[in-house]
């Protein structure tokens, strides 16, 4: 069903498919469906961000055209810290925070990804705070600063 939907909604110029612009894998069965779709479509690059890292155990075979970026900030962050995921993303509030946390975590600054290109490299990276944040929160204020710098 996922494969049918995919083929109905893409054209031949599409080379990359992002799985979930928001949301995550909710079960091993659902993850295996996406892995099967990737195997059926070797001409496409499938990529995703996930905090459901427990689903990507040693018994899961990931095809070469499937790019997982582990997202820091979830229940299974210990798997990232133990080195099971070379490619991971951390959300930061500023360029300075990306530099500081990168040096603290891995002795070099995190590069900030602006276009999802880092999802195809085997290295950790940062994403600037994005999306919707609780009204009046520090994150909301930081997001307003980020947006004003982009527009300014």
Language model feature labels by segment:
Residues 1-152:
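Class I S-adenosyl-L-methionine
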């Amino acid at each position: 069903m996922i494969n049918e939907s995919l083929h109905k909604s893409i054209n031949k110029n599409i080379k990359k498919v992002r799985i979930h612009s928001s949301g995550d894998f909710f079960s091993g069965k659902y993850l295996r469906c996406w892995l099967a779709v990737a195997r059926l479509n070797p001409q496409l690059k499938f990529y995703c961000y996930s905090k459901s890292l427990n689903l990507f155990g040693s018994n899961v075979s990931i095809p070469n055209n499937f790019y997982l970026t582990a997202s820091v900030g979830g229940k299974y962050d210990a798997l990232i810290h133990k080195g099971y995921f070379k490619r991971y993303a951390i959300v930061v509030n500023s360029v300075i925070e990306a530099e500081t946390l990168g040096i603290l975590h891995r002795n070099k600054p995190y590069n900030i990804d602006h276009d999802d290109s880092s999802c195809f490299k085997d290295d950790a990276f940062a994403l600037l705070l994005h999306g919707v944040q609780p009204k009046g929160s520090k994150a909301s204020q930081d997001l307003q600063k980020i947006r004003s710098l982009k527009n300014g």
